Every structure is written in structure tokens, then in C-alpha cells.
């Protein structure tokens, strides 16, 4: 492919609003163009990368027994209203009306649609298990699109769905998809971690997330040097209950004027923050019910993990109580809250690390006052102990090793959805005993377009992009130093033809530009191997440069293909 025939609008400077390396380099290298905030055009180079990623995905999906289909991006809102997600998605959902005032959405995902199709198409267990997938654009009305294509309003995804007649079928499909995802990311050349994750608005109980470590990642991964890895919302520590040691002292109420935080209360009482019992109040939203107040207790130096609390309660949404709410239910404002004397309609949850603690300090539900020497059972009761805290770096993970933190970009997610959607839409089959049973579902997704950002973040340098060979837009970039010199152009065309005949994808820079411009653009574009045809063209000698390492070597044109094959194999390892 001649570079003069390609649309590659390289730039010397990055956009002023570009915050991260991948955004800067993909714009500068002419891969993407911003049409609007959060809306991007994928120019020819980027689209070539996407097509290669798609091909790897299709090959691995075929191996896993999944079949490709294509669902509409424009979806009737009725399906989403039926599932309850029309409201649950909130402002992130693109909503529109047709000319007859019927409600539609632009699909961010397709559980409702595919379940309704399978409901009408499959009626017997004999047609199951079945796994379908698609590669399609999704839409999400992001409040703050950022980081280029990493978080946009339109993005391409692989989304797959499995349907089984029993749990064994779901487990098998889930495991096959998990293996396929690992194969996909391995082939692409990404560094990634498979982590335990929360299912969020997708529903279901079991899920794994595939995350690519990167400084700009919006997820925090808690991991060890062993096998343990989880996102911060799901991460746990190795916990051993402690027995109560010492005697319970007399409950005493003390004035703590101006103490509105744990640290201020600790200073006022002459205690450590860990000796303060922190009381956080939430309102839990359950389907068809009024908001229910929930108090969560934990050590003053710990943080409440709202995802864990919501998961334990099984609520649709967990809201932080306002000052008005806390005054309504507890008669006090934040900073003076505690579990002693609360109304019976307030559910009290306590983090498991509080077990065994005695003579704690806590809010008295009276502004400006705290209790000291408060104890479980004697002074107040809790409805349930559990893991409701956010882990801290350095703590011991379940595998016995210290927890480390790193940021990560979510690149894939797989869920065991169970029967939630099939029950909502009546997607049932007759089982072996002739009974109607709901199909058991799994859901699987890869952010195809955001993979470009993840790959770029892990591989780019100060000079430009550095693509792994498996997904690079071209295998080789041939650069005649001076396009005006016939011997250089003739040699460049000759080796390009030979390399293409050998099966390589070659970009040849036939532009009448200065050598410095060509080399700078080549570094920006990031093709794995650069072949420079220069002053030694008359001798049949060219220079090979490995983009990843910067190493160079001179070879005779007759040995070029052999050397490139060796180098590409080495760079792929």
C-alpha cells in the first residue's frame, strides 16, 4: 500500500485537551479524528487495527463454539422498561422517539433483545446450549467523555450470550468463553489480569473482569504476586475472627463539640481512629418498596465499600443518606451518628473486623456528643456482621500474600447471569421431564475499540505508537529516503512486491518528503519493522529497524525476507 494513497493526517502537536499518551499519539499519528465530544472517526490505520482484532476474536469464538449474528442498534424502549433497566441506566441511556412518538433507545448492550429472540426461537432443551455473539457499536451518553476513545459515547464491542438448560451447561459455556478471552488477549499481546468483579447493573452473581494494567486505568486492581486478583469493589482480605479480650467498662456519654469527623472525634477523646466506631447511613432502594434506612458500622480508619453493602442487601440502588435523612431516622447529623437507641426500622450492618472489639467510641445520635466504652449486645445489637469494607494496600489477601494496588483498563467482562432475564421475558424451554424451565444465561463482552487505547498505553513511547505485530496496521514500513532517486524507488518497489508476495502487509512511504519527516511519521505510526532504502541502494543493502527496541541492522535485499521473518517472530514473543 502506497502511503500517498492513504489518509494518515499526522500532526506535530497533540490536541490541547489530550491528557493521556494513547489519546495524544493516536491523534498525532493520524489514527483517529474527533467528530464531537465522545464521538470519534476511525481513520484507515485505526480501522485496519480494529479489523485485525475482530479477526482474532472471530477465530477464537469459532473455536469456543459461538456463532456470530448482528442485532439492531436501535431498540424499542418497551423491552428495557420490561427489564427495569430503562430507569436503572439513568442518564447514560440515549433515548429518542420516532415520528409516531414511540420510545426507542440506542443500545448500550443487548440482553433484552437477544433474550426476546431466543424466547420465540427456542422451545426445547435439545436446542441448547447455544452461544451467540456480535461485533457492533454501542452507545452510552457519557457525562464526561475523556481519554480519547477510551471513554466515548459510541464504541465497538464484542457482546456474547449463552443459553443453557441447566447449570452445567452455563458453567461449560462460561469456562469456554473465559478461555477464549485469554486466548484473544494473549494473541493481541496485552498484559492483563483476570480479576474477580462485581456484576453491577448486568445482574447475576458470578463475574470475572479482564483488566489491562495502565496508569490511566479507572479501575483499581487489588492483586498479589500469587494467583489472587480482584477489583477494589470486590477485593477481600484473609480474615480471622478475634475473641474479646478485657473487661467491658461503663458506657459514658461525653461532649465532643466541633467533632464532625473521625479524626476530630479521636482527637477530642484522646483515642486512635481505629478505636472509633464509624457509622454510615444509606437508603436502600428495593423494587416496589419505599427507601429503607441502613446503618453500616466499621472501624474509623476503614472505608465503607458501598458495592459490597448493596450486593449483600440485594437492593436495586444504594444511596448515601442526606443530612435531612439522618436527622429524620436518627435525630442527629453526620459526625454524631451511632447505633445506640436507633429505631427498629433501621437495618444495622457491621464489618467483620469489629468482632472482638470492646469499649469502642461512637456517635451518640446527639449533635456534639459521643459515647465511650460502647459494646456489642450490651449497648446495641447488629443485624449482621460481614465484609463491608474496602481493602487496603499491604493487607493479607485470601492467598496469604500482601495485597498490591495497580490501575487497570477494563477490556473484557464475563458474567453468569442465571435466569434473571429469561424469567423477565418468559424465555423457557421444555426440559427432559417435559417441564417449562427458564433458560440459564451467561453474558460476555470485550471493548473492541477501547483495546486500541489499552494497547497504546502499554506500548507507546515518547516518539509514537508501538503496535504488537498481531494487530499492527501493517507488518513492515518501507521508506525510500529520497523518492526523487530512481534507484531508491525502484528498490523500494521491488522489495515491497517481494514482501507482499511472501504474505506480509507493507506500507511504502512514496511521499516526496524530507527523510526526517518520513522517519518521524514512521515512529508515530508504529509499524513493527521499518526498512529504510538509502544511499546503499546501489549495493543492494537496506537498513532494518525494530520499532519496539530501536535496534538496527543492515542486510542485503536478498536476505531481507529471511531476517524479517526472524525479527517478527522475536518481537511477537
Swiss-Prot record:
The keyword Protein biosynthesis applies. Its EC number is 6.1.1.15. The keyword Protein biosynthesis applies. It comes from Limosilactobacillus fermentum (strain NBRC 3956 / LMG 18251). CDD domains: ProRS-INS, ProRS_anticodon_short, ProRS_core_prok. HAMAP family: Pro_tRNA_synth_type1. PROSITE patterns: AA_TRNA_LIGASE_II. The gene is proS. Catalyzes the attachment of proline to tRNA(Pro) in a two-step reaction: proline is first activated by ATP to form Pro-AMP and then transferred to the acceptor end of tRNA(Pro). As ProRS can inadvertently accommodate and process non-cognate amino acids such as alanine and cysteine, to avoid such errors it has two additional distinct editing activities against alanine. One activity is designated as 'pretransfer' editing and involves the tRNA(Pro)-independent hydrolysis of activated Ala-AMP. Keywords: Aminoacyl-tRNA synthetase, ATP-binding, Cytoplasm, Ligase, Nucleotide-binding, Protein biosynthesis. GO terms for cellular component: cytosol. It is found in: Cytoplasm. This is Proline--tRNA ligase. Homodimer. Belongs to the class-II aminoacyl-tRNA synthetase family. ProS type 1 subfamily. One of its GO terms (biological process) is prolyl-tRNA aminoacylation. It comes from the Bacteria. One of its GO terms (molecular function) is proline-tRNA ligase activity.
